[in-house]
Amino acid sequence: MHSCSHTHFVSFKLPHFFAPKSFVVSSRRELRVFAVATTVEEASGNIPAAPISLPQGSWKQIAGGVTAAKGFKAAGMYAGLRAAGKKPDLALVTCDVEAVAAGVFTTNVVAAAPVVYCKKVLETSKTARAVLINAGQANAATGDAGYQDMLDCVGSIATLLKVKPEEVLIESTGVIGQRIKKEELLHALPTLVNSRSDSVEEADSAAVAITTTDLVSKSVAVESQVGGIKIRVGGMAKGSGMIHPNMATMLGVITTDALVESDIWRKMVKVAVNRSFNQITVDGDTSTNDTVIALASGLSGSPSISSLNCKEAAQLQACLDAVMQGLAKSIAWDGEGATCLIEVTVKGTETEAEAAKIARSVASSSLVKAAVYGRDPNWGRIAAAAGYAGVSFQMDKLKISLGEFSLMESGQPLPFDRDGASNYLKKTGEVHGTVTIDISVGDGAAIGKAWGCDLSYDYVKINAEYTS
């Protein structure tokens, strides 16, 4: 914790985020979590809050984000990396022990320096001790000089933490083509290291520090049991624009105190990413910097997980899925210029992958997204997007519902209350709620979900004005 005389950054908790099946806020985009400078005394009682909607499960949501699990500390601070303002722009997450590490990265061939570095490190190392994240400069397309800047930062933070350089992973977000402001970053590192704690406040500061065009910070943690022992899984993420499978301008750090072997952990993280971050879309752009780093300290005392085919693995996978899906939905909800979250559920396929592919196609459709923003219950656009997903299904099995309104049955349009359906879209947008689209394509048992947001005039304005 900072001393009470120091500037501290917190996020205000907005009321009424949660509803039985979706989350809402009471006044659209004006009421959001935002960073403010205050003292710790003044900040008392303000905890990190983002509109996180978790799936149903045996876990309970708790405070703490990345510091909820045993062995983890975090910090966030302003280091002068952003173009303007005093919002935190440098974050650090550390583990007291060697944490089993996994990473999932962008599929963009124009990969940023930190992506190249992390992939290389994790090819030979099973563990990590720290993740350093900067906002402001993406350090993508910066050549050898940008890569060396990053190595210098890694070396400096490793020295301060008294760990090996290869135990430090790094993530960057910001303007493509700009190198890290190395001098400012290096100057800030001693303060950042000394600011670390396992407090909720520092977890929140870190979550704020990694944001760019985000209007809310995203942080969540859950508590459950693995093998009868209490474990925790927490995480933070950033993302608002350039969000499209596979992953997007999306950074994430996931932590757990469960004990799990390296190869199993990496497979579990990949599965969870495929069910969450790879199932969200805002604008169809895939970033150069996508990174999710997941660390497992093993300090909970839970049984070691050495196989995917055991009850303990299923218990941990469920918690991991829940945290990542909660963060992913929050990112889509916070899509640039958006007025609502769109949740697409597809049933009736033979495999989960097929259902997920159709759901992703519908959630990604610019025409569907524009129709939702225009409050137009356009079943034709939904049907078309499902049809071009690349998954074969029988037309006469197709069913489509929008909220409580059935739009299509047996591949044929149904008479429905168009004004009522339009009003459903309007009212959902007014409270920045969740529009649900349910699709059935057959008799299979598989289910897949995807999340997106509507496409508004403001999206164009925000990105037209974003600096290059």
UniProtKB/Swiss-Prot annotation:
Query: What is any one GO biological process for this UniProt entry?
Result: L-arginine biosynthetic process
Q: Which GO terms describe its cellular component?
A: chloroplast; chloroplast stroma; cytosol
Domain of life per record = Eukaryota
Q: Which UniProt keywords apply?
A: Acetylation, Acyltransferase, Amino-acid biosynthesis, Arginine biosynthesis, Autocatalytic cleavage, Chloroplast, Multifunctional enzyme, Plastid, Transferase, Transit peptide
Q: Which residues carry this modification: N-acetylvaline?
A: V36
Using the record, list the residue span of the signal peptide; answer none if the entry has no such feature. Answer: none
Entry's localization field: Plastid, Chloroplast
A single Gene Ontology MF term assigned here is: L-glutamate N-acetyltransferase activity
Which portion of the chain is the transit peptide?
1-35
Q: Which reaction does it catalyse?
A: N(2)-acetyl-L-ornithine + L-glutamate = N-acetyl-L-glutamate + L-ornithine; L-glutamate + acetyl-CoA = N-acetyl-L-glutamate + CoA + H(+)
Which pathway does UniProt place it in? Amino-acid biosynthesis; L-arginine biosynthesis; L-ornithine and N-acetyl-L-glutamate from L-glutamate and N(2)-acetyl-L-ornithine (cyclic): step 1/1; Amino-acid biosynthesis; L-arginine biosynthesis; N(2)-acetyl-L-ornithine from L-glutamate: step 1/4
Residues at site: Cleavage? A248, T249
User: Any idea of its EC number?
Assistant: 2.3.1.35, 2.3.1.1
Coiled coil region boundaries: none
* Pfam family membership, one: ArgJ
UniProt KW Membrane keyword = no
> Which residues does UniProt mark as catalytic?
T249
The site feature described as Involved in the stabilization of negative charge on the oxyanion by the formation of the oxyanion hole is recorded at T173, G174
General function of this protein: Catalyzes two activities which are involved in the cyclic version of arginine biosynthesis: the synthesis of acetylglutamate from glutamate and acetyl-CoA, and of ornithine by transacetylation between acetylornithine and glutamate.
Stated family: Belongs to the ArgJ family.
What does the annotation say about its assembly with partners? Heterodimer of an alpha and a beta chain.
This chain belongs to the protein called Arginine biosynthesis bifunctional protein ArgJ, chloroplastic
